Amino acid sequence: MITKLPPTSESNNSLSDELLEKINAYWRAANYLSVGQIYLLDNPLLKKPLSIKDIKPRLLGHWGTTPGLNFIYVHLNRIIKKFDLDMIYLIGPGHGGPGIVANTYLEGTYSEYYPHISQDAEGMQKLFKQFSFPGGIPSHVAPETPGSINEGGELGYSLSHAFGAAFNNPDLIVGCVIGDGEAETGPLATAWHSNKFLNPAIDGAVLPILHLNGYKIANPTILARISQEELKSLFVGYGYKPYFVEGSDPQLMHRLMAETLDMIIKEIQEIQTNARKNGIVKRPIWPMIILRTPKGWTGPKEVDGKKTENYWRSHQVPFSDMKEEHIKLLEEWLKSYRPEELFDETGKLFPILAELAPKGKRRMGDNFHANGGLLRKNLRLPDFRSYQLEVVTPGVVEAESTRIMGSFLRDVLKLNPHNFLVTGPDETASNRLTNLFEVTQRRWLAEYLPEDTDGGNLSLEGRVLEILSEHTCLGWLEGYILTGRHGFFSTYEAFAHIIDSMFNQHAKWLQTTLTIPWRAPIPSINILLSSHVWRQDHNGFSHQDPGFIDLVMNKKAAVVRVYLPPDSNTLLSVTDHCLRSLNYINVIVAGKQPALQYLSMEAAIKHCTAGIGIWEWASNDKGGEPDVVLACAGDIPTLEILAAVDILRQSIPTLKIRVINVVDLMTLQPKEEHPHGLSNTDFDEMFTTNKPIIFAYHGYPWLIHRLTYRRSNHSNIHVRGYKEEGTTTTPFDMVVLNEVDRFHLVGDVIDRVPKLGYLAAYTKQEMRHKLIEHKEYIHQFGEDMPSVKNWKWPYGKE
């Protein structure tokens, strides 16, 4: 299909015939290099007839999307030069990796980052061989690819990353290609609404380019099979102004794309000028492109008599059985790009074509924003000690820990007005972070109603961004952080699972960047999990799931951290530490409900610095040997352990108890497995080598066993945690259902301390009676017993 140019006076001004031919040649060069990466081991310039020895034994990669990506790249290069734009290129269909590698090679960036891939025939041969080859580079737009901040392995995140990159980056334009397969994913579908949060006065611009090539792996795409009228209505409904660039004839398509981009850039600049100079700040109708090109454009039209170009068969490798006729077909395909017109005898791109690329940091492969660590500025942080809660006696004062954390984050926002964002799925208020609204508001560029002034906290320039999509919130934050800024994401613990695989992708990205010297460290992603399992008694079973921690702990120690601060002062210390860190995903689990507070700020700092410690004030074994070790991790398990200690002290005063609290789960691992891990000597000194250990843990109990299985006293560790028992009930009944309550814990101690035996029979019977009383009470009154609800630590500091 060929779409004629619109009859505008500018049609002939965007591209002269000479420039059109150069752009087409540059595009041919990118396509040639892309095919070469997929197929060739040697003979990069086809100086001799192609033979089986020149071809890789395992053919890997994706051709179908690549020529379209190359087409877009060369046209973005043109407008970067014409308008002197600061622009980066995000690739949703990241399986088109050979195209981006090809273009960064053509512009010279690739050889600067990888000098052994030189701008000659030898370098080209290495470029071809390394692609999807052992010891080489991945098939996707991975961290190894200059200019990339979105690998596009798992689809769906390109557009939210693009908007995240544009927030607070007023001079940046983000060209974002969304594949028509990717457009079928949930995260991408929601991310279109990001335009309701982009403020043209203070943010950059995003240019979405929906690439319709018609097919996924072996299936048509939905958006390519609906009418243009329906497609246009869809994106007009999303709030965009779609421009259609459709066809298969390169000459017409180059002219149409150039004309369209010129109009769009002028439109973007007009929107920004109106907002920045004329003070017209409202939600604009941002332009976008719907680009329809054949899948596998310029590739073989048929292979073995079967349609290939403009069909799903071109998605990956159009043919891989390298029989004689296929070798001939590959040679014809490569020669169709006329490489002798593109590269000189040495294999270098002709200067007349090389001059089409932007220079220096204007090249998309070398743009600072695509290596955001180079732009990173350390946060200005207030002294977290200033927000401390006065704790004179442990376990007496109550406070909402996340509310105190919110005061600290409020002032972080205040001190960092241009490089710190808070995102979340409409849970900022629920998670007790409302103090943020003392210095900022929720970003909102959609419609306003009069009642919004009554507690709506909406603003055109707010730095709290909320949309009821965990994917979009985290995508914004990742894009913001990948371009060198800082941020914070809070969500309900159970629903963090929505971003499980998204977390995986970022963790893999971080892990890979650690091996790439030119990738500068970026700020950490900081995730608060609140409204957690033990205080979701009111919402019920669907809201009760602490398993996100398990997922995080599967990742390499080099890129993840998990913290379970038991009170507000430890939470402040942990938060300050996380905001200062680089190249991590930090997960903090903290409750929002009123809870007992245990440590002074001085004690909290020492405890958090170590990550684990004996609480002397809760123990009575100092100067001797404990009979039992009671360990805890998490605010509610800590409460229940301390309440169990109280019962044991009263009923069995001769029992020697050591209480250990864990803030940093990684300390439980051996030092050889994690840098925060305790040495075997330190672990044994703390936990003993032969005493029973009762461990009350916030999440699923087997994680503690997994972390400690190599410890000498592992056989004596008995873990209580969440075991998928829950409903709508009372807070204390939640721990009873999962046997993490004080009464079950006392029973565990009695069962596992050999010397107690018959001596503690009466105490154990009393615990059974208490559990019966508990059930009867909540069923009659609908709330927990006063003795439970009002319990406080009765022993002071000693």
Curated annotation (Swiss-Prot):
Pfam families: XFP (PF03894), XFP_C (PF09363), XFP_N (PF09364)
Domain of life according to the entry: Bacteria
Cofactors: thiamine diphosphate
GO molecular function annotation: aldehyde-lyase activity
Enzyme Commission code: 4.1.2.-
Keyword terms, alphabetized: Lyase, Thiamine pyrophosphate
Record InterPro entries: Phosphoketolase, THDP-binding, Transketo_C/PFOR_II, Xul5P/Fru6P_PKetolase, Xul5P/Fru6P_PKetolase_C, Xul5P/Fru6P_PKetolase_CS, Xul5P/Fru6P_PKetolase_N, Xul5P/Fru6P_PKetolase_ThDP_BS
EC top class, as a word: lyase
One GO-annotated biological process of the protein: carbohydrate metabolic process
Presence of the UniProt keyword Transferase in the record: no
Family according to the record: Belongs to the XFP family.
Database matches in HAMAP family: Phosphoketolase
NCBIfam families linked to this entry: PRK05261.1-1, PRK05261.1-2, PRK05261.1-4, PRK05261.1-6
PANTHER family: PHOSPHOKETOLASE-RELATED
Name the UniProt record assigns to this protein: Probable phosphoketolase
Source organism of the structure: Protochlamydia amoebophila (strain UWE25)
Lineage: Bacteria, Pseudomonadati, Chlamydiota, Chlamydiia, Parachlamydiales
